[in-house]
């Protein structure tokens, strides 16, 4: 079957610019896809059930279409427990991911911490048939957030300060309960004990409302969330590296080849 050459570096640069994620060379150098000719090759682009990830995926899709490919969009699939099996099965060809979080999903005992270490470890840990293309400079980190009033009342600046803040309830997606940076990680690394309330909107408006209403005292919110910009919320620093560096990185199936 004839391979059709596409300039994936151009596609990625366009996609990340559209998504306001900064510059990256990647969906990876000179690449080829299995197919006959541009316009007859269909690539499946997927996204997480989170708005900023969907924006990046849509930007990838539009850039691929601009290069002459037919794109099948499968957006807002869900979280990793749902979409990773589809990626491993080859049902999805291009998917925006985050280096640190994906590494910890695949290897809860990962010891890499710096951006380059995390990226290298991820590339060596990915299941057969999946590749991490070049990571972007941009990150979209998990973070732990309290209200500004709660931070002031308890003199909070870092995650470790929560150990002296009384009874705490953490809110986040249900899978946070078992993530390495969830309640167990908070306890093991910082000595912070929390109760947990699942809120299934990936740190979105429902989580922010629960935090501001006092239903929870601590929230898992992504660093790119615009709700963090108005001064009513405080992002706690993470000096011990509970959260790994999480750069935007395209995952590609074996149908997209660096030739």
Segments (PLM) and residue ranges:
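Bacterial signal peptide processing site
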Residues: 22-25
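Periplasmic-binding protein-like
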Residues: 129-131, 136-140, 224-259
């Amino acid at each position: 079957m004839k391979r059709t050459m596409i300039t994936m570096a151009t596609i990625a640069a366009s996609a990340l610019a559209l998504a306001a994620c900064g510059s990256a060379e990647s969906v990876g150098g000179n690449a080829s896809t299995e197919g006959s000719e541009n316009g007859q090759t269909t690539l499946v682009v997927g996204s997480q059930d989170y708005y900023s990830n969907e924006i990046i995926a849509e930007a990838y899709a539009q850039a691929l279409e601009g290069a002459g490919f037919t794109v099948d969009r499968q957006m807002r699939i869900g979280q990793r427990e749902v979409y990773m099996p589809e990626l491993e099965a080859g049902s999805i060809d291009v998917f925006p991911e985050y280096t640190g979080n994906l590494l910890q999903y695949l290897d809860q005992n990962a010891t890499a911490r710096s951006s380059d270490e995390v990226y290298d470890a991820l590339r060596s840990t990915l299941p057969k048939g999946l590749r991490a293309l070049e990571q972007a400079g941009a990150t979209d980190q998990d973070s732990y957030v309290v209200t500004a009033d709660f931070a002031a009342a308890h003199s909070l600046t870092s995650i470790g300060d929560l150990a002296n803040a009384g009874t705490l309830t953490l809110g986040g997606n249900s899978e946070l309960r078992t993530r390495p940076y969830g309640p167990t990680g908070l306890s093991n690394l910082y000595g912070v004990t929390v109760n947990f309330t699942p809120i299934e909107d990936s740190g979105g408006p429902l989580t922010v409302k629960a935090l501001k209403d006092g239903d929870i005292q601590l929230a898992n919110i992504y660093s790119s969330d615009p709700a963090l910009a108005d001064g009513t919320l405080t992002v706690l620093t993470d000096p011990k590296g509970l959260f790994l560096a999480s750069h935007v990185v395209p995952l590609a199936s074996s149908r997209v080849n660096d030739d």
